Amino acid sequence: MSVVTVQLGQCGNQVGYEFFDILCSDLHSKPGHSTKRENDYYQTVCKEQFFHEEECGDLVTRAVLVDMEPKVVSKTLSMAGRSGKWKYDISSQFSQKQGCGNNWANGYCVHGPKHQDIVMDLVRKQVEKCDRLGGFFTIMSMAGGTGSGMGTFLTRCLRDAYPDSLLLNQVIWPYGTGEVIVQNYNSILTLSHLYRSSDALLVHENDIIHKVCSQLMNIKQISFRDVNKVIAHQLGSIFQPVYTSEEALHYCRNPLGELMECLVPHPEYKMLGLRNIPQMSEHSLAYSTFNWNGLLKHLRQMLIANAKMEEGINWHVRPPSQPTAEKTSLRKELQFNTSVANLAILRGKDVQTASLEGFRDPPLYTPWLSPDDAFTLWKTPRAFNKYEKSATLVSNSQFLLKPLDNIVGKAWNMFASKAYVHQYTKFGIDEEEFLETFTTLEQIIASYTNL
């Protein structure tokens, strides 16, 4: 089944480019420990999901590019064309010469409705090229104007136009010390509205990705492109073909459907986070060897202690020996991270020898789901990107409670003093809308806190 990707704003277009580029690099890499037949099928499934193939063999993305300023879209199109491996459909893009000025309300209330018909027509054309539509994957920032405001509006339009299709929003969480003074307003408005329209939100935190670049990749002068490459690698590690059960004879052809079924058992819990191991520079990788037991031991502790990268894991955090009674006090003392559901994706050599029983411990999960329902394993012997062995954990858990509480608190303090509220009311977002937003997010915080 095919996925139509919608790249929204500067951030969405730059991350989208790196995402498609890494998919194509992976397609052309050595099959590693896969048979030729297996590798051929892997390539077929990847192409079917994210590209359509022209008669000449060129791969063209199933994507729509949207930005209110033309510069980034133009650069993205030309970079893809120069890659020689893939390209965008140049007729599947929309840009204007006037941005949203980092104002969510301007994007949501003005530019979104104004350009809705044109953008949705581009989406429709991509949908019509799919033999079977698996759903939509949007890539956007939470804190800006076009990506967040217009992106949120277009997400609502997608939900209205395709009510039976799955909709996954990948959102970039802003730096804690961002340059945009109203980023907290933009972020809470984005989150609360997406929660109504989207089936799930896959969240990447800029601060964490920046640390990965610095501490794990050993990059000295970190650029936005470095950050985007890490995000793209993590996304690729989810979406490239895998076997979704021990008995599976073929690679999964419905990634969004399988993902939602595994991770979103209840519409109150839609926040997904991602942990990837290993992540390191090519220089370090040349001198490193890995075994599955070591990788999975680290990944499990990252989950339990809510460590978002393998550096600096708190090994003192343990699951409670008693169910729910101890969980609250343990969380307060040691930041134990309770999960709704987890999906582990293993790729590479000797993958059949990996044991994941530790991820099925009942204390890791909320009591209203059995571990067999809450934990899912996907795998493939084909290595991904440059790693002989790699593991990804997609988690619906309490991982975002602290950053969410922080961003809501900062936004509330600004709102209580009416700071910058006039910039939103003049475009049509009134104070009542803000209050509804705070109520929605407080409910999400309460739901995850009480797991």
UniProtKB/Swiss-Prot annotation:
It is found in: Nucleus; Cytoplasm; Cytoplasm, Cytoskeleton, Microtubule organizing center, Centrosome, Centriole; Cell projection, Cilium. The keyword Nucleotide-binding applies. InterPro entries: Delta_tubulin (IPR002967), Tub_FtsZ_C (IPR008280), Tubulin (IPR000217), Tubulin/FtsZ_GTPase_sf (IPR036525), Tubulin_C (IPR023123), Tubulin_CS (IPR017975), Tubulin_FtsZ_GTPase (IPR003008). Pfam families: Tubulin. Belongs to the tubulin family. This is Tubulin delta chain. PANTHER family: TUBULIN. GTP binds at residues 143-149.
